[in-house]
Curated annotation (Swiss-Prot):
Gene3D superfamilies: NAD(P)-binding Rossmann-like Domain (3.40.50.720). The keyword Ribosomal protein does not apply. InterPro entries: Him1/Fmp52, NAD(P)-bd_dom_sf. The gene is FMP522. PANTHER family: OXIDOREDUCTASE HTATIP2. GO terms for biological process: import into nucleus. The keyword Membrane applies. It is found in: Mitochondrion outer membrane. It comes from Scheffersomyces stipitis (strain ATCC 58785 / CBS 6054 / NBRC 10063 / NRRL Y-11545) (Yeast). This is Protein FMP52-2, mitochondrial. Residues 1-45 form a transit peptide.
Length: 229
């Protein structure tokens, strides 16, 4: 039976690929996305909603995702790109959590989140702590199924400027991808992430399931899943 999917962060590295693979999937007959900018994507299945004010997104999500089965979030930033720690938290935690609450109100069953390795709400490091708090609070919403993907370094073309350090790490990762050294950097391509996210969300929730399901997929597990694509 076909269902609907809502995608947040569809202009990003992972979000755009989730949009691509969700559109190809026979599971989803309608896909919606909202953002300040819209992806360069045309399909009769896809409803693109442009809204510059992210404070209005929860209301849009709650209305648009009514009856949808799945919500994908690839929305994320870095402290450098966000411009400040406060703005980073507002984007990575605030917007994502508000969207998750709206998706829950809309009746979404499966929530898929692109997170980060070592996410921990008790960490002393802002990036890891913010990711961990978001994971914990989304799990607490008790979707029928929550899927959290924790990729290592994400590879692929990005419009935004990378720091010199990140560029060096990414350069090394391209040579370790798929070999025995990959455990050191555990890179993942955006295209792989999109396909894996959609594949996992496409698996049926057991009808006998009474408790919320939480699947946390580590960077190593993502690497193993990518080899099977």
């Amino acid at each position: 039976m076909a269902a609907g999917a809502f995608i947040l962060g569809s202009t990003g590295l992972c979000g755009y690929q989730m949009l691509r693979f969700a559109e190809k999937s026979s599971l989803f007959d309608k896909i919606s996305t909202v953002g300040r900018k819209l992806p360069d994507f045309k399909s009769e299945k896809v409803h693109l909603i442009q809204e510059a004010d992210s404070d209005k997104w929860p209301e849009i999500i709650e209305k648009e995702a009514k009856g949808y089965s799945t919500f994908f979030s690839g929305l994320g930033s870095t402290i450098g790109a966000a411009g400040s720690a406060e703005n980073f938290e507002r984007i990575d935690y605030g917007i994502n959590y508000a969207a998750a609450k709206a998706a829950k109100k809309a009746g979404v069953q499966t929530f898929v989140l692109i997170s980060a390795p070592l996410s921990n709400a008790n960490s002393r490091f802002l990036y890891i702590r913010t990711k961990g708090k978001l994971e914990d609070d989304i799990i607490a919403l008790k979707f029928a199924r929550t899927i959290i993907l924790r990729p290592g370094i994400l590879l692929g073309e990005r419009e935004k400027f990378r720091s010199i350090t990140e560029s060096i790490i990414v350069g090394i990762s391209k040579y370790t991808h798929g070999n025995f050294l990959s455990a050191l950097t555990v890179p993942a391509y955006g295209e792989e992430m999109g396909q894996i996210a959609v594949n996992l969300a496409s698996e049926p929730i057991p009808q006998s399931q009474t408790e919320p399901i939480v699947n946390i997929i580590s960077a190593k597990q993502i690497t193993n899943l990518a080899k099977k694509l």
